[in-house]
Amino acid sequence: MKKEKGSRRKKRVCAFCVDKIVDVDYKDVNRLKKYITERGKILPRRISGNCARHQRRLTTAIKRARIMALLPFTVE
């Protein structure tokens, strides 16, 4: 019996690298909301498609926005 070849997913590119954004701003709430689940968790890199540098900066920006009460810690 022959194995079926799995469909290869297209590699996602980092949206911040494409837009040539160096720093992720914690005040840009609309952009940050794209990388948070409906439960309020930060999306992992393999799902969001960000590079390692921008994923780290995105994480710190989301955490800063949560502390400044721009984003919720959890969604009720």
From Swiss-Prot:
Protein name in UniProt: Small ribosomal subunit protein bS18
GO biological process: translation
Organism of this sequence: Carboxydothermus hydrogenoformans (strain ATCC BAA-161 / DSM 6008 / Z-2901)
Taxonomic superkingdom: Bacteria
UniProt keyword annotation of rRNA-binding present: yes
InterPro entries for the chain: Ribosomal_bS18, Ribosomal_bS18_CS, Ribosomal_bS18_sf
Stored Pfam families: Ribosomal_S18 (PF01084)
Gene3D superfamilies for this protein: Ribosomal protein S18
Alphabetical list of PROSITE patterns matching this protein: RIBOSOMAL_S18
Function: Binds as a heterodimer with protein bS6 to the central domain of the 16S rRNA, where it helps stabilize the platform of the 30S subunit.
Entry's Gene Ontology cellular component terms: cytosolic small ribosomal subunit
